[in-house]
Amino acid sequence: GDILDLGPDYRARQDANDRALLDELQTRLADEDHPKVRQDLEILIQSITDEIETRRINREFMLPYYNIHQLIFGSFNALLDPRNDNSRYAKALDRLRKYNGSEPGFTPITELAMARSSERFDDGLLGPYQGEVDKDLSDASRYIAGTRTFFERAGLEGWEDEFAKLEAQLDEYAAWVEAEMLPRARTGNQLPAEVYANNLKNFGVRATPDELIREAQYVYQFIRSEMKALALRIADERSWEDSDLVSVIRRLKAEQIPQGDLIDIYKERLADIEEIIRREDIITLPERDASIRPATEAESAAVPAPFMSPPQLINNTGQYGEFVLVQSNPALGEDAIMDDWSHDAITWALTVHEARPG
């Protein structure tokens, strides 16, 4: 039932907790002889050190901003996941009361988020990207509706009044974001160099932005050349007059699969791929079937591209990942339906990537 700490001086508490954990890990490292255990400890130490540095950099440059609607959606999505043991579901009521401040000793998380942002309004920091804030406001109602669906599906009792209280707080928070954060948002998406480089590092990229740009320019041209050669082959095999890369991609994307048939087609592709894997003895496959399902509207708002939804990793009792097929980006309004993942050519590569063996 624990929730995100956004109380006063929360960053100092986070740093203190992490430094205490660092001391413990470094003590264990000094007493450890096994090379693989030492390696694990060194990885943990580096990860925590990076987290402390990330908080320092963000505090120096960036105005705090929180997408509370998405945070709460993700929190209950993980807890009330149908793949979980339903004995955990009752904890959602405790978590709900903590989020909305009904639980003694807790302040509504929306109030804390507003306080943490507004206390730094005068520090000359860089605001969030305007496009990000606009999208968050557009998706707010979808996250609320999606979170409500989790509670309805879980079959819990006595959540409705507490949820209504939280929903009212979220509506108030959205109005505050529009009135206070949106005017402070930056119009360009470029980040300070220090923040950008640190973000890269947190994704495992230790190269500097300049090094990465140079490498990307070279690799882009290399991959594009390979794609052009492949486009020529495809056009020749299909007797298409236009054989340039863009024309071939457009022709391939025009081969759209009806929405009602899409999941079945992906399951057919999966069966074909698994047969190839068995025939060629590439890897050992699980005995259970892989799961492929369409995304909900709220999931599409959170991740507007197909993704693998991982199971719980701690105390896993047999839960497994799901290939979630996203077919729309709700933030785009009339252009919400995408054609990137529903044409025949993409079904093979995407199934390999998100299902098996990916």
Regions found by a protein language model. Give the residues of each.
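N-terminal maturation segment of proteins
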Residues: 1-358
